[in-house]
Amino acid sequence: DSNMEYILPFNEVKCLIVGYGNIGKKLVGLLKSIGIKVDVIDKTNFQNLDKLVKNNNFVINCLPLNNSTKECFKLSTFTSMSSYSYFINVGRGETVNEKDLFYVLDNNLIRGAFLDVVQNEPIKKDNQLLYLDNIFISPHIANFSNKSQDIQIKDFIVNLSRYTQNKPLLNVVYNSIGEKI
């Protein structure tokens, strides 16, 4: 099988994590624990992204969405990646130019992509990414299990109680300009 040449021992795999928030930090720890070589770009220094994506087996996007990250993964970034590399997006869908991603995947300029998020969710049936063989798109329900549902229900009950007592809520999410969402 021609794919066997791409199977590497973990200690020979190189991964670039783009975005060093909660998700990025957890990924770094997990990947390093199994011997994968990891480099990190935080959200303040990703302007050199096109240069930094080279020579990695995996490029994992964990970026939040803001004015400076919108569509920062574009044709120049994808064509700078090695032909044997994979792109993974667990950040925000809008940080990726999907037309450019489609182009590089359709022309086999990179090996493949794994997306937990897309630009417009839910994904439309006519989205051209759905018809490629070298992409896997999850339905953005990675935490949808019985255990995660139990945790979410407990968190909701705790927050409901805190709300009725005029206490600050837990796990509040803020948008890019610092407003609660």
Regions picked out by a protein language model, each given a short descriptive name:
Residues 10, 15-19, 59, 81, ...:
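Generic structural signal for small/hydrophobic residues in well-ordered secondary structure
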Residues 28, 32, 105-106:
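Gly/Ala-rich phosphate-binding loop of Rossmann-like dinucleotide-binding domains
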Residues 43-128:
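Rossmann-like adenosine-cofactor binding region
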